[in-house]
Amino acid sequence: FFRKIDPNHKFHWEWAPSRGKSGGILCGLNKENFDILMTKCGKYILQLNLFDKNKNCSWALMTVYGAAHDEQKPEFIAELSSMCHSSNIPYLVGGDFNIIRHSGEKNKKTSLSHFSEVFNSVIHLLGLREIYMTGGSYTWSNKQESRLWKSWIEFSCLLSGRIYTLLPLSISW
């Protein structure tokens, strides 16, 4: 598989295995830009502590595939909170959280669940900020102005307060 997508071996590849019906997590990083200092694999999160060769600093990338079923969401939220709290370097959290944060994320009117409230509280307590996708239409939006959020295509990105100084072009607040 990797020979087809990376025939020149320019990427570090790390993955978390699939669990039950949930897919796994695959993350590739360009070797010219990053060294992987540490890998931590949770049930829902693959954390890579990186050395950024261009910025000459370390930061963590946490790739998420959140629990799809309500009975597992508390475990996912606890893992997210624990991994973020234990990081002693700036971090970026991105992936499919499988939790609707705001009612505007769906094309249908739905009320927010208890998990949405808990998830938003954790994000607030951790001081995370969301990077909103802007610009042109996306392939999953059916070329419409507004995004259609479907659990298998959603990608959200949250930043710890310390990392925005490393990635100034991605955000402004």
For each predicted feature, which ranges?
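A shared catalytic/ligand-binding motif for oxyanion handling
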Residues: F1-W173
